[in-house]
Amino acid sequence: PIAGSMVLAAILLKLGGYGIIRMMQIFPTTKTDLFLPFIVLALWGAILANLTCLQQTDLKSLIAYSSISHMGLVVAAIIIQTPWGLSGAMALMIAHGFTSSALFCLANTTYERTHTRILILTRGFHNILPMTTTWWLMTNLMNIAIPPSMNFTGELLIMSALFNWCPATIIMLGLSMLITASYSLHMFLSTQMGPTLLNSQTEPMHSREHLLITLHLAPLLMISLKPELVI
């Protein structure tokens, strides 16, 4: 069910990150070198999840693996226990909660009209539902973390914190973000561009669907313009 996916991606996955933040407070901040294997594992897991996204043909699975890859960055930032790392982790968790939930919502609107989640069968929606294409573009840009979005603020803080802790981590972080941009572009082009493969009549997006996406993106834009609200 799409509601379960939205709650899982937006709230439950982030509760795990919040739990790690609370648990890490019992460890001394001077001994973060001991956690090097876990940081490497988190960043490597983020890269593997991103690579899995690139080969996905199922739209919903692609968005789910995207959430996992972002949580890898969050876990790595939390473990080093620096103020910038914790601020970046909180910012990215909140921003990606809105983004991934909006992506699941958009995937459901596509599924209700095509009755399939296979990427190659959902193309051509920019000809039929141009406003939906606009929502897809905005949400994918947030997923890529373009400035001045909250996603960008979170990833920039995480990159800075990890680079100060160990400069070698920039290689894994850069690779992860490059693959994120690749699969986000692939997802947008696969669902919106190209010729329409539907033979049946497609109903337009309802007002409630536009309202639902607006309720995801409006708070995200608000905290992007005023990050002091959350970090």
Swiss-Prot record:
Its main location: mitochondrion. It catalyses: a ubiquinone + NADH + 5 H(+)(in) = a ubiquinol + NAD(+) + 4 H(+)(out). One of its GO terms (molecular function) is NADH dehydrogenase (ubiquinone) activity. Pfam families: Proton_antipo_M (PF00361). One of its GO terms (biological process) is electron transport coupled proton transport. It is found in: Mitochondrion membrane. The chain crosses the membrane at residues 1-21, 34-54, 63-85, 89-111, 128-148, 156-176. Its EC number is 7.1.1.2. It comes from the Eukaryota. It is an enzyme of class 7 (translocase). PANTHER family: NADH-UBIQUINONE OXIDOREDUCTASE CHAIN 4 (PTHR43507:SF20). Core subunit of the mitochondrial membrane respiratory chain NADH dehydrogenase (Complex I) that is believed to belong to the minimal assembly required for catalysis. Complex I functions in the transfer of electrons from NADH to the respiratory chain. The immediate electron acceptor for the enzyme is believed to be ubiquinone. This is NADH-ubiquinone oxidoreductase chain 4. The gene is MT-ND4.
